[in-house]
Structure formats: C-alpha cells, structure tokens
C-alpha cells in the first residue's frame, strides 16, 4: 500500500489555508489529539454512529439494516488528516481518509514509521465561559488577572490608566482588535473597544466560551466554543438521521470488503469519545491491560476552564454495549461507577483505552518483563492457537475462553498483532505443571486439618481463598474480595492473640534469665513446651512445605508420618495463663512430641542476650518477596496461600536482640541449608525467647522511620525518610529542594515532570493517585522523570529499562 503524503502537516484541499494547529486543538478540547497522517489507526463504526446520534439528537432506530460483514473495529491506514472550522459557527472538525488493511498487511511484523507531524497542543492559553455582563452591548469582557498576566503582553503600569491594543486572529485568519485596559474598583483587566463587535459577529451568548492563545512567537489567537443548545428547526436540505447512519455503515462495509478508501468526519465537541484512535494505543489498552470487576481506575475529564481533571471510579461490569448489532466490540465495553456525587454528568460506560486501571500494569509501557500475579489457566491465553484476533483481547479481558463464557468467535481476519505480543508475554510463566502441583498440595493439606481446633480453622480461612481461586474464573472476583477481607480479619485476630499471650508471659522474665544460665540440656527441656506450641501452630504449613520439597528434590527435615495423621496430637487450653508453667501459649500437648532434634540445636537467629538492638529486619531481595519459595518463579510471593507480608509469621515491629559484643549475625533463610522449617521455627523461637529475656528498652525512633531510595537521571540516588511527611505536597517540595528542581514537581501538566514510584510488588504507579497511608506502606523506591524520560518511556517501552534501576538498594 502506498502512503499518501498530501495530508502531511494537515494541509487543506484546493489551496485552502491550513488552520493553526494550536488554536484548533484549543477549540477542540484538551483531551483531543488527532492521529498522524500515514499511521495505522483503529476505526469504530459504532462510535461513528454515536456521533451522528449526538449531532441529530436521535438514537439509532431498530429498522436500520445491519451489516454482518462489517467488524466492530477496522484496522486502517490513515492517509490524510485535514483540520476544518465551520465558517458560520466556528465549530472545529477533522476530515480523515482511511483505507482498511488487507489480511497480509495486518500480519506484518514491523509497523511502518509514522510520517505525519504530531498534533501541536497549546501551551499558553486561557478559556473563560461568558457571563451575561460579558455579552452585553454596553459592557466589556472581564479577564481573570492571572489569565491576563499569563497570555496578554504586559501592561505599562506607569500610564494612567494602563492600557494597550491587542490584535488576535481567529480560525479563519481574521484579525480582531481590542482595547485592553486595567481599571475599575476594584481594578481588573477588561477588553472594551472592539469586544461588542466581536460578540455580535460570532453570535455569542452567555454560556459560550472564549479562548485566547499566545504562541511561541508571542502572537495572539482567538477561538470560541458555542454551548450545546437543542436544535428546534432542522433545515429540509439536511439528511435525516437514519440516512446518515445507513450511509456511514454502508461506506465502511464497502471499504472493508474491497480495501478501498473512505472518508469520515470527526466532530470533537459533538462526540463524547474519539472513534478513530492510534493502533498502538488500542493494542496497549486491549492486550497489555487486564481488568476485572471491582477494580479501581481513573479517567481524565475536561473542566470548564478547558483544563483536565482526574476522576476515580470502580469497574462494575464488562459486556457488549450492543450485543446484537456489535458483538465482541471493545467500544464502551466497560461499565463503571463514579465516586463523586456529580457522576450523573459522566457516562456509565467507557472504553478500555479511556481509563487507567489502578492495578499491577503501569500507565506506561512496561519496562520489565511481564510477570503474571496469579497462575493462568491454559484457556486464558490472549492469543488462542497462536493467532492474534481482535476478539481474543476481549476474551482475555473477560477471564476465560470465548466458548466457556458464551462468546462467539469473530468472523473477520486476524490483525497480525502476534509479533508485538511476543515482546510483552513471558510464556515461561504460563505453564500448568506448577499450578497443578500447587492445587494438589493445597487439597491434601486441607484434608488433614482438624475441624474442632480454632487456631487451625484460622489457617484454613487463610488457605481457602487461594485454593478456590484456582478453581474459579475471573468472573468471581467480587467473591474473592470478600474472602480477602475475611483473611485479613483472621490475620489480625491471630496477631492479637499472639501479642496478648506474649504480654501475659512477660512476668516470667526472671525465670527465663535463670534458665539461660543453666546447661544446654536443661534449657532444652524447659523450652520444650514453647517450642512444641509454636511448632504445632505452624505444623500444617510445614507439612505442605515438606510435600513441595519432596516433589522438587530439595532437602528437607524428616517429619514423622504421625505429625499429620495421629489424632492424639491436639491442642488443649490450660486453666489459667498465670499458672507459671513456662508454656508460652498456655497449651498442653497430650500426644507425643513432634519436634525434630535438629530444630532444638540449629537456627539462624542470634543467641540470647540482655540488651535490645534495632528492630528486626529480615534479609530480602526486595520488599514483598522475603519468603519466596521458588527463586525462579517471580509470581510466587506467598507461602501456600499465606502472604508473608501480612505479618502473620513475624510482625515488622518485633525487635531483635544482639549480643553486646556484636558478633551475632543473621543469615538468610535458605531451603538448601537446614531447611525452611528450621529457619522459620528458629526465628520464631529465638525472637520470642529474647523478647522475654531482654531487659533493655526498644529504640522507638528506629521503628517509625521509613527510608526509601529516590532516583533521578543524571543524579546519584538518595535516601529519604518519607515518615517525616504527612502529604504528597510536602514530599514534592522536599524532592524539589533535594534535586534543585523547585517548582517543577508541583504542576506536572505544565512542567512535564512526573513522579512515579515502584511498589513492593515491583509495579510502576503514578505518585499521588493513592491515599497517602497506602503509598507510605507500599512504596519501594521513587523515580523522578524529566519530560525527556516520560517521552522515552512512551516511545520505547521496554527499551527504556535504563530509566529504572534493576536492583535498587532498599533501606
């Protein structure tokens, strides 16, 4: 296919003068961006029909013929883009010439370089909605002070009154002259002479908007936006709404069948969404983002001052907008609910590329290999049978195979997206062998759990959500959210019980000190009840781990079979916690001891001492992965359904104790040394013993500090204690001072600088979107992105991996 160069730079036809791109986009809106000529785009006839319905105030009737051969989205080559403005109303619109790609062109590995010039967005401008006094014949136009100082040339305040003449050009290159004066009580900026002429010529009324722009050459431009008003009288020469719907559908269907060119007109102020978008934007949204019901998201909206604002919402459903005419369409396939009370002004349905889900996938192309948070089923691949059909993205989006969910396969050719997907999918993470072993171990462990023991029941509650997740599809995410809440509640109850029991045994400190001075054999006998209590508390987890280690041919301590089958080994509570029997958990063991010999003699924790030291800090590669069982499997951060970060095993506030000589060191937990059971049990046993044995005081100042690394291209990474701040504003100010970029981080939309952070799950998120407490608890390190870094991330994706450190130091 030969590319047309007549549209490069948005040139007009037949000598028509090219419109100013900045002014056109200012009138169109801050969220509108035309694709470049020569690029590949996706055309949605369903969205085009929506525009026709909006302009004619009439929805599509049922008797309009359907075109089964017309797919819900067409991959096209954009040959020409021309910007226009209506002579009578100054309404801006764009004319696009599209040509559908052939099946062979859709399968091309490399996308042709875009030859067009990117759309130029305005930088210095202001927009004001006119009031009744602004449109009166005897008044003037009141300009906000900050807007006048930002856009208009500076006034000479030595004059009385300060005044000057302004010359501005509109979309049709017509000059308008105004007298700019600073007067009144209180004094304000006004446009007087020439303003009433402009209002009359443009037929402006209260509610319309006026836009002033100053370009790089300090030239002024002037544009208008008419408020939406209902059409009462339609000229007879105008085509009916039904005729327009039939015409656009017939033209698109013919072009799709013959691969011929067709023309569409895009009216940005009439259309609620763009129905011609860049192919790269579509691929990123549909194939590189996975959403589910209940997920949080953000979306940009235009304000009255022609700026943008983010609104937050929740995904409430995923389905076709019109399953009869447009099955398997991505157009407005996401049902949403908005947070704020003004949600009535926003659409209840949006398209996937319009939102930014607050999930594991970043808003920019991923800089790291794609890691799946949970094991995938064999039927959830986004590329079934190695093909890249457009419908496969929607099948993946809905959490299962198309046939299982009642979705019909699409009947139009594939679009050749497979080469791009190869760069993003890590197929090594999509095997099912590990998933089957994981599910089998969970099922075996759950069958060996007694039903009458409260402590074990709490562990069952922690295991069941993850076990059930492997048997359910993504459509049951709402149930999983409820189960996660129950899991967190069970964890809090267990931690509260452990803390209470520890505090009840603090009076036994003197006895513990005497025990530490006795021979090792006597210490082992006295500590046996405590050790047995902790061992039984985690016996279920050790049993699961033993099975897993045997399958993976890794060494593990030998446990007797009776550990899991002997019904006599049960917990029994004693009468009083103050009995002084030395049993930490106040349990009596009625059966035989199941404590292996090596657990009483080996361990990685420091030896006993009488002095407190800094808080316990487990060695870890990076946060959230401290108890990884499979070093080669990055999607296994939990211990058989129990999240190590939840604080179930060891709360982060438990202190550790070091000997006064400073020779006690902690070695990493390893499965190849004495086994994970030794490390976990020794950590619990020694740390609890030291808590009861020590006589010092905890240094509380070390507990409250939360140091993170901050990186910036061209600068050395620095550490920052974010616990000193209480808001994002304070953090931005401190980062600006730290790297000598004051004022650039407070307004990212204007400066182009962005602050992003990587959380404990190694995901890149935009700083400022989450509540402050959630950010403090989940941040791993912070990255300051210059405008060049942001552009590099957007253009090169994974090729920009140098922007982020691969192994940053975590404090």
From Swiss-Prot:
Record comment regarding domains: Interactions between auxin response factors (ARFs) and Aux/IAA proteins occur through their C-terminal dimerization domains III and IV.
Protein name according to UniProt: Auxin response factor 8
Outcome of gene disruption: Seedless (parthenocarpic) fruit.
PROSITE patterns: B3, PB1
Polar residues: bias regions: 469-482, 544-555
DNA-binding region(s), residue ranges: 126-228
Subcellular location: Nucleus
GO biological process: auxin-activated signaling pathway; flower development; fruit development; response to auxin
Gene Ontology MF terms: DNA-binding transcription factor activity; transcription cis-regulatory region binding
Protein family per UniProt: Belongs to the ARF family.
Keyword DNA-binding: yes
Keywords, comma-separated and alphabetical: Activator, Auxin signaling pathway, DNA-binding, Nucleus, Transcription, Transcription regulation
Region annotated Disordered, chain positions: 467-496, 544-565
Protein origin, superkingdom: Eukaryota
Summary of the tissues where the protein is detected: Expressed in the whole plant.
Main location per the UniProt record: nucleus
Subunit organization: Homodimers and heterodimers.
Function: Auxin response factors (ARFs) are transcriptional factors that bind specifically to the DNA sequence 5'-TGTCTC-3' found in the auxin-responsive promoter elements (AuxREs). Seems to act as transcriptional activator. Formation of heterodimers with Aux/IAA proteins may alter their ability to modulate early auxin response genes expression. Regulates both stamen and gynoecium maturation. Promotes jasmonic acid production. Partially redundant with ARF6. Involved in fruit initiation.
Any Pfam family matching the protein: B3
Domain PB1: 705-789
InterPro entries for the chain: ARF_dom, ARF_plant, B3_DNA-bd, DNA-bd_pseudobarrel_sf, PB1-like
UniProt xrefs under CDD domains: B3_DNA
């Amino acid at each position: 296919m030969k590319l047309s160069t007549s549209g490069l730079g948005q040139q007009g036809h037949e000598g028509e003068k090219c419109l100013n791109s900045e002014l056109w986009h200012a009138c169109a809106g801050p969220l509108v961006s035309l694709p470049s000529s020569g690029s590949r785009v996706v055309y949605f006839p369903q969205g085009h029909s929506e525009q026709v319905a909006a302009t004619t105030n009439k929805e599509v009737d049922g008797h309009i013929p359907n075109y089964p051969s017309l797919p819900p989205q067409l991959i096209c080559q954009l040959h020409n883009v021309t910007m226009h403005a209506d002579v009578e109303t100054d309404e801006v619109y764009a004319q696009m010439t599209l040509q559908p790609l052939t099946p062979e062109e859709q399968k091309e590995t490399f996308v042709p370089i875009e030859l067009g010039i990117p759309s130029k967005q305005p930088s210095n401008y202001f927009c004001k909605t006119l009031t009744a006094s602004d449109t009166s014949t005897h008044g003037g136009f009141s300009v906000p002070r900050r807007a006048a100082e930002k856009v208009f040339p500076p006034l000479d305040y030595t004059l009385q009154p300060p005044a000057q003449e302004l010359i501005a050009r509109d979309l049709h290159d017509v000059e308008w002259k105004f007298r700019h004066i600073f007067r009144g009580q209180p004094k304000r900026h006004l446009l007087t002479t020439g303003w009433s002429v402009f209002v009359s010529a443009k037929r402006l009324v209260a509610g319309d908007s006026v836009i002033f722009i100053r370009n790089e050459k300090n030239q002024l431009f002037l544009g208008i936006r008419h408020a939406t008003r209902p059409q009462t009288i339609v000229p007879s020469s105008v085509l009916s709404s039904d005729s327009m719907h039939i015409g656009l559908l017939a033209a698109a269907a013919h072009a799709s069948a013959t691969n011929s060119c067709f023309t569409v007109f895009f009216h940005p102020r009439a259309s609620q969404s763009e129905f011609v978008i860049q192919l790269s934007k579509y691929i990123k949204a549909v194939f590189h983002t996975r959403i589910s019901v209940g997920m949080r998201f953000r979306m940009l909206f235009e304000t009255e001052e022609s700026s943008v604002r983010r609104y937050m919402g929740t995904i409430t459903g995923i389905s076709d907008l019109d399953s009869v005419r447009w099955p398997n369409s991505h157009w407005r396939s996401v049902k949403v609910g908005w947070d704020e009370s003004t949600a009535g002004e926003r659409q209840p349905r949006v398209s996937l590329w319009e939102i930014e889900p607050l999930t594991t996938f970043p808003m920019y192309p991923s800089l790291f290999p794609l890691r799946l948070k949970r094991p995938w089923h064999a039927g959830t691949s986004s590329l079934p049978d190695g093909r890249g059909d457009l419908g496969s993205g929607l099948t993946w989006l809905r959490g299962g195979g198309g046939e299982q969910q009642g979705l019909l396969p699409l009947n139009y050719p594939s679009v050749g997206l497979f080469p791009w997907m190869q760069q993003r999918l890590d197929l090594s993470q999509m095997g099912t062998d590990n998933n089957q072993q994981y599910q089998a171990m969970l099922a075996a462990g759950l069958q060996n759990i007694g039903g009458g023991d409260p402590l074990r029941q709490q562990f069952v509650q922690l295991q069941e959500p993850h076990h059930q997740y492997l048997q359910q599809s993504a459509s049951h995410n709402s149930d999983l959210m409820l189960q996660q809440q129950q899991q967190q509640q069970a964890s809090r109850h267990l931690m509260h019980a452990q803390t209470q029991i520890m505090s009840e045994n603090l009076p036994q400190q003197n006895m513990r000190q005497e025990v530490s001075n006795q021979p090792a054999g006597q210490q082992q006998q006295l500590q046996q009840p405590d050790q047995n209590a902790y061992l039984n508390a985690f016996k279920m987890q050790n049993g699961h781990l033993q099975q897993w280690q045997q399958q993976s041919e890794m060494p593990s301590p030998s446990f007797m079979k009776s550990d899991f089958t002997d019904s006599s080994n049960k917990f029994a509570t004693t009468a009083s916690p103050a009995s002084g029997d030395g049993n930490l958990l106040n349990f009596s063991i009625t059966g035989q001891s199941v404590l292996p010999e090596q657990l009483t003699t080996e361990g990685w924790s420091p030896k006993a001492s009488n002095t407190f030291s800094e808080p316990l800090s487990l060695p870890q590669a990076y946060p959230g992965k401290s108890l990884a069982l499979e070093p080669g499997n990055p999607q296994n951060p939990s211990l058989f359904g129990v999240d190590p970060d939840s604080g179930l095993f060891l709360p982060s506030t438990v202190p550790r104790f070091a000997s006064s000589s400073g020779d006690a060191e902690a070695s990493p937990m390893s499965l190849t040394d004495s086994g994970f059971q030794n490390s976990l049990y020794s950590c619990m046993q020694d740390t609890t013993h030291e808590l009861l044995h020590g006589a010092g005081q905890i240094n509380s100042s070390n507990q409250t500090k939360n140091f993170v690394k901050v990186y910036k291209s061209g600068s050395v990474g620095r550490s920052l204690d974010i616990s000193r701040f209480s808001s994002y504003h304070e953090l931005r100010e401190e980062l600006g001072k730290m790297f000598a970029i004051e004022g650039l981080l407070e307004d990212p939309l204007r400066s182009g600088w962005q602050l992003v952070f990587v959380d404990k799950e190694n995901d890149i998120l935009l700083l400022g979107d989450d509540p402050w407490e959630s950010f403090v608890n989940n941040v791993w390190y912070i990255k300051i992105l210059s405008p060049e870094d942001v552009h590099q991330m957007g253009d090169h994706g994974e090729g920009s991996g140098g922007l982020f450190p691969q192994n940053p130091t975590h404090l």
